[in-house]
């Protein structure tokens, strides 16, 4: 599930489409060594300098992998209490586009129904000591999410940010504001 990411040294894994506690348990298990999980144990991987890091140090540090589960639809919200109860879940990340689609309002990520579901996730996660992340496609939506209690914002994408900066520069060249 996330073996390559961990073996190259990723400090966190982000697993999409988690809709149940069973899927959450499988994700956590894949990210952790025994006895907390089922991740294969080998210290001769890139993240351990191919054996250059003492085994005890490597295994201790690698066991601290941050596990981020993506809750991307109404089914995940319906099962959220069970998902949040899985030991080892650090962050639940909301996919607002998928959530909007599951609610029948595809693409409307700031629709009150979507924002209400995100607020429910924040409230339930806070009660379980789990942080919440969410994607924002504008500074305004990012600010609103922070105000709601979301702590981790996945902002836009590199190409959109670059395109918007280029458009602003082109407008400035033409004396437009």
Task: Please report, for each region that a protein language model flagged, where it lies by residue.
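Short, small-residue-biased leader/transition segments that mark boundaries at the very start
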Residues: 1-3
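Non-catalytic positions within long, well-ordered alpha-helices that form the structural scaffold/packing
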Residues: 6-7, 84-85, 146
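Conserved anion-binding
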Residues: 10-87, 98
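Short secondary-structure boundary segments
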Residues: 17, 96, 136, 157
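C-terminal helical cap(s) of enzyme catalytic domains, especially alpha/beta-barrels
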Residues: 21-37, 159-177
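Glycine-rich, proline-tolerant flexible connector loops at the mouths of alpha/beta enzymes
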Residues: 94-110
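Short, electropositive alpha-helical surface patch
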Residues: 142-159
